[in-house]
Regions:
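Alpha-helical membrane-anchoring segments
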Residues: 2-244
Length: 244
């Protein structure tokens, strides 16, 4: 593969183009992996209710066709990136946006967090100017962290989800037998407060590197809590956390 300068637009810093190329590639790779790990949602066989946003009355073959179009378009993005074919990258990206939108419209269950995120990231990267696309993508990620944190700042999280996450992390780290007592509630709140800290750090240029580091650390903790040494969640949950 060449240096990537062939794909650089006039007046656009090379690092912005490289970042966008990396993002496109990661979306395609993780998108394919997530489709595979949740394949029952995307290639239904009639044993699970389909709840369309707009009822076209179409056959399940339409769902299958759109899902395969999504697979092929993401493969096209990867191939075109390696071969340095900007026009094919753009065409494949547009097809993936349309296919993913169609899949979601045909079944509300497909509006997974990762699918929603990937859809908007692709829109920004495909139709925005490089710098604006990266800024929009960053703000989307910050918004997800912020919303996730705020939604956890209530009694429900402290009483249910917080203890559940902490138990998974304790299992993974071999600390399940330790009695935490009254300190436990403050430990549970570390999850949303950590997300708020990451969101704030990612907004400011000076603290962005720290924000990225904190984000990586936070997702390692979540992978421990949710992974095979913790609560043994499904691959789709772990893959999305790994991407994020």
């Amino acid at each position: 593969v060449g240096s990537g300068r062939e794909l650089q637009a006039p007046g656009v810093p090379l690092d912005a183009e490289q970042t966008i190329a990396w993002l496109r590639g990661l979306i395609a790779v993780f998108g394919l992996a997530l489709l595979g790990s949740t394949n029952g949602l995307w290639w239904p066989v009639g044993d699970f209710p389909v709840v369309p946003w707009i009822d076209f009355g179409g056959p399940l073959a339409l769902d299958h066709a759109l899902a395969w179009a999504l697979v092929l378009s993401w493969l096209g993005v990867l191939a075109a990136t390696v071969l340095q074919m900007p026009s094919l990258i753009r065409a494949s990206s547009i097809i993936s946006i349309l296919s993913l939108t169609g899949c979601i419209l045909l079944d509300q269950h497909r509006l997974q967090v990762w699918a929603w995120e990937f859809l908007w990231l692709q829109v920004f990267l495909t139709f925005g100017q490089p710098q604006a696309a990266l800024l929009s993508s960053r703000l989307l990620v910050v918004g997800i962290y912020f919303y996730s944190a705020v939604s956890k700042l209530d009694a429900g999280f402290v009483q249910t989800q917080g203890p559940w996450l902490w138990q998974g992390l304790s299992r993974a780290m071999g600390l399940a037998s330790i009695p935490w007592g009254a300190k436990a509630s403050s430990l549970y709140l570390a999850f949303p407060l950590g997300e708020l800290l990451v969101a704030g750090a990612l907004v400011l240029r000076r603290s962005r590197r720290w924000g990225i580091g904190l984000s990586v650390g936070m997702h390692i903790i979540l992978l421990l809590a949710l992974g095979p040494w913790g609560w043994q969640q499904r691959p789709g949950v772990l893959l999305w956390n790994l991407f994020f």
